[in-house]
Amino acid sequence: MPTVNQLIKEGREKIKKKSKAPALQGNPQKRGVCVRVYTVTPKKPNSALRKVARVRLSNGIEVTCYIPGEGHNLQEHSIVLVRGGRVKDLPGVRYKIIRGALDTAGVANRRQSRSKYGAKRPKAGAAQATKGGKK
């Protein structure tokens, strides 16, 4: 433990917060171009084919991004908007693609949590038909 004189002379060292999404360089989102779109298998207790894309960001950094939601229209050379946020069961995937922005289409027929998947609000008649005409 330092003495009062040592603290006056040196001061305490600030703990630097390490960024969880360093490729974004402090920005909330970054634009990028898909270099490769493919699937990967998750870590041990889970089993699936998760859709991911290798994206070259506008700052030149290349990152692996998760494509959320069911189905997507992405292919090589698609322009995408990338945000931070890791996928727990995919090692090395620390970014997500924003659905409904730039070349990425929103999720079709999405009824709940629509804003997270870039889905437009369904028409009133269509919503009634899918629910089975409840009054």
Curated annotation (Swiss-Prot):
| Keywords, ordered alphabetically | Methylation, Ribonucleoprotein, Ribosomal protein, RNA-binding, rRNA-binding, tRNA-binding
Q: Which domain of life is it from?
A: Bacteria
User: Which GO BP annotation is one of this protein's?
Assistant: translation
CDD domains for this protein: Ribosomal_S12 (cd03368)
**Subunit structure, as described in the record:** Part of the 30S ribosomal subunit. Contacts proteins S8 and S17. May interact with IF1 in the 30S initiation complex.
What is the phylogenetic placement of the source species in the record? Bacteria, Pseudomonadati, Aquificota, Aquificia, Aquificales
Q: Name one Pfam family in it.
A: Ribosom_S12_S23
InterPro entries xref list: NA-bd_OB-fold (IPR012340), Ribosomal_uS12 (IPR006032), Ribosomal_uS12_bac (IPR005679)
Q: Which residues carry this modification: 3-methylthioaspartic acid?
A: 89
Region described as Disordered: spans on this chain: 106-135
Task: Please report which protein family the annotation says this sequence is part of.
Answer: Belongs to the universal ribosomal protein uS12 family.
Query: Which segments show compositional bias classed as Basic residues?
Result: 111-123
Q: Where is the composition biased (Low complexity)?
A: 124-135
- What is the purpose of this protein? With S4 and S5 plays an important role in translational accuracy. Interacts with and stabilizes bases of the 16S rRNA that are involved in tRNA selection in the A site and with the mRNA backbone. Located at the interface of the 30S and 50S subunits, it traverses the body of the 30S subunit contacting proteins on the other side and probably holding the rRNA structure together. The combined cluster of proteins S8, S12 and S17 appears to hold together the shoulder and platform of the 30S subunit.
> In the record, what terms sit under GO molecular function?
rRNA binding; structural constituent of ribosome; tRNA binding
Identify this protein by name.
Answer: Small ribosomal subunit protein uS12
Q: Name one GO cellular component term.
A: small ribosomal subunit
